[in-house]
From Swiss-Prot:
Oligomer status and interactors: Component of a multisubunit histone acetyltransferase complex (MSL) at least composed of the KAT8/MOF/MYST1, MSL1/hampin, MSL2 and MSL3. Forms a MSL heterotetrameric core with MSL1.
Binding site for Zn(2+) 1: 44, 47, 67, 70
Organism: Homo sapiens
Source domain of life: Eukaryota
GO molecular function terms noted in the UniProt entry: histone H2B ubiquitin ligase activity; promoter-enhancer loop anchoring activity; ubiquitin protein ligase activity; zinc ion binding
Role according to the record: Non-catalytic component of the MSL histone acetyltransferase complex, a multiprotein complex that mediates the majority of histone H4 acetylation at 'Lys-16' (H4K16ac), an epigenetic mark that prevents chromatin compaction. The MSL complex is required for chromosome stability and genome integrity by maintaining homeostatic levels of H4K16ac. The MSL complex is also involved in gene dosage by promoting up-regulation of genes expressed by the X chromosome. X up-regulation is required to compensate for autosomal biallelic expression.
BP term (GO), one: positive regulation of DNA-templated transcription
Record's protein name: E3 ubiquitin-protein ligase MSL2
Record's GO cellular component terms: chromatin; MSL complex; nucleoplasm; nucleus
EC number: 2.3.2.27
SUPFAM superfamilies: RING/U-box
Predominant location: nucleus
Region listing for Sufficient for interaction with MSL1, in residue ranges: 1-116
Zinc finger boundaries on the chain: RING-type: 44-85
Length: 577
């Protein structure tokens, strides 16, 4: 797979670092914003550290990578990515390894420029950015184990294709090649030697043209004799560390030719760069004791200030005659698809457009005078960004914000417990399971927190017996009935022996002793009883039963006078409310 995000972030970060102006606070802010994103794009999804021997899924479009030693372990991503679950599809990605090396070289370059001093002086974001720089530089130190200085150049990962073939004479004496020193002059239309994708011709180069202040020479101690028979038709390898390795020494030129004719051409094309990455077997020829003595005052141009101490370099050459010109270790991929589906871990702020190679390095022209250093008074910095291994970034939140969110969460939970204190246990468990969700990846300080509540399911039936926390069937008695208090009829009442006298139409049932005719009619309509026979008890004969069939209720009630004392015992019905 092609790491589009990491490549685009590397190009943007390199352009900002190389064009950094101490008097421009906006550039400082952009660098502080892009460096954490670049570091996050090269993080292992399992351990969270910088990738070591990175492997990536072959048939996936997600930007998730793991170390070779972390293969098979669980990724720290929530939710998990469905595209890279199968570790059998993971293979070694060489372009990712190159990007990791470029990240280390970029960190080393920053540590030896004025940008590092500005980062240390910035109180708001110094700790996080310094941690990222130390992560890249210390990782490179452990890999290379240099002995001369703490931040040295690591060029062992930068093989350079060469057309010259070394001889097999191991007894060649060390001789400085001062005559073959190449000084590059940059015209007004050329931007640090990279104007277009197709490279530049040799007409733009000059021999022994000084730097903006004075001429700089590089002494190269060679351990072998180089054949120079066909150097008129071929070009020696040129190691431009600013464009390839982004190291701190400005321009290091390893020249093995006695002269260069103006008719030759120096081409830097994307195809040759990609083809150079495929050459695995390269003959390594070491050039030790490379001592750069460059001194200049331009901070963002092709020449940088360096100390006079000697640094150990390991420059490698290959004997592949098919490749000519420069070879960049930072591989430039093909034009990436911008309309791809973005993953959930990427926010809108992370969408960085890929930049062409011609705009990586922008510096002043040769004829321009050295810029006047302006002391910067104000520094604008963003909120410190903490890297998260699941593909996203979260800004660091201060302790006060964390405490406020904790107390807010407790208050919400306490309020929800009070509101559901009189519900059934089943609904109470459902409400406890619904917790407030605070977004972690896109949470910015100052933005209101959104609390998600689940709407409780509406209950069927009346509230009788369900009003308390522990429902009971013996609660609906007389005035304790909530439906009776609200003058409503009970519906699907769970109470045993519900005696609510209100009907569905809002009218109240009448007592039997008030209007007996209407009370019996209401009873028949409410209970659905067909009044065909009523047992009447007589005071004298308790077993006598009068069957009233076919006659209306009024004739039955009118059959006895009001003086009859057995009328109270005749109708065996009670209405207790």
């Amino acid at each position: 797979m092609n790491p589009v995000n990491a490549t685009a972030l590397y190009i943007s970060a390199s352009r900002l670092v190389l064009n950094y102006d101490p008097g421009d606070p906006k550039a400082f802010t952009e660098i502080n914003r892009l460096l954490p994103y670049f570091r996050q794009s090269l993080s292992c999804c399992v351990c969270g550290h910088l990738l070591q021997d990175p492997i990536a899924p072959t048939n996936s479009t997600c930007q998730h990578y793991v170390c070779k030693t972390c293969k098979g372990k669980k990724m720290m991503m929530k939710p998990s990515c469905s595209w890279c679950k199968d570790y059998e599809q993971f293979e070694e990605n060489k372009q990712l390894s190159i990007l990791v090396n470029c990240y280390k070289k970029l960190c080393e370059y920053i540590t030896q420029t004025t940008l590092a001093r500005d980062i240390i002086e910035a109180v708001d974001c110094s700790s996080d950015i310094l941690a990222l720089l130390n992560d890249g530089s210390l990782f490179c130190e452990e890999t290379e184990k240099p002995s001369d200085s703490s931040f040295t150049l690591c060029l062992t990962h930068s093989p350079l294709p060469s057309t010259s073939e070394p001889t097999t004479d191991p007894q060649a004496s060390l001789s400085p090649m001062s005559e073959s020193t190449l000084s590059i002059a940059i015209g007004s239309s050329v931007i640090n030697g990279l104007p277009t994708y197709n490279g530049l011709s040799i007409d733009r180069f000059g021999i022994n043209i000084p730097s903006p202040e004075h001429s700089n020479t590089i002494d190269v101690c060679n351990t072998v004799d180089i054949k120079t028979e066909d150097l008129s038709d071929s070009l020696p390898p040129v190691c431009d560390t600013v464009a390839t390795d982004l190291c701190s020494t400005g321009i290091d030129i390893c020249s093995f030719s006695e002269d260069i004719k103006p008719g030759d051409s120096l081409l830097l094309s994307v195809e040759e760069v990609l083809r150079s990455l495929e050459t695995v077997s390269n003959t390594e020829v070491c050039c030790p004791n490379l001592q750069p003595n460059l001194e200049a005052t331009v901070s963002n141009g092709p020449f940088l200030q360096l100390s006079s101490q000697s640094l150990s370099h390991n420059v490698f050459m290959s004997t592949s005659p098919a490749l000519h010109g420069l070879s960049c270790t930072a591989a430039t991929p093909k034009i990436a698809k911008l309309n791809r589906k973005r993953s959930r871990s990427e926010s809108d702020s992370e969408k960085v457009q890929p930049l062409p190679i011609s705009t990586i390095i922008r510096g002043p022209t040769l004829g321009a005078s050295a810029p006047v250093t302006v002391k910067r008074e104000s520094k604008i910095s963003l909120q410190p960004i903490a890297t998260v291994p699941n593909g996203g970034t979260t800004p660091k939140i201060s302790k006060t914000v964390l405490l406020s969110t904790k107390s807010m969460k407790k208050s919400h939970e306490h309020g929800s417990k009070k509101s559901h204190s009189k519900t059934k246990p089943g609904i109470l468990k459902k409400d406890k399971a619904v917790k407030e969700k605070i977004p972690s990846h896109h949470f910015m300080p100052g933005s209101p927190t959104k609390t998600v509540y689940k709407k409780p399911q509406e209950k069927k039936g009346c509230k009788c017996g369900r009003a308390t926390q522990n429902p009971s069937v013996l609660t609906c008695r007389g005035q304790r009935c909530p439906c009776y208090s609200n003058r409503k009829a009970c519906l699907d009442c769970i109470c045993r022996g519900c005696q609510n006298s209100y009907m569905a139409n809002g009218e109240k049932k009448l007592e039997a002793f008030a209007v007996p005719e209407k009370a019996l009619e209401q009873t028949r309509l409410t209970l659905g009883i067909n009044v065909t026979s009523i047992a009447v008890r007589n005071a004298s004969t308790s077993t006598s039963v009068i069957n009233v069939t076919g006659s209306p209720v009024t004739t039955f009630l009118a059959a006895s006078t009001h003086d009859d004392k057995s009328l109270d015992e005749a109708i065996d019905m009670r209405f207790d409310c």
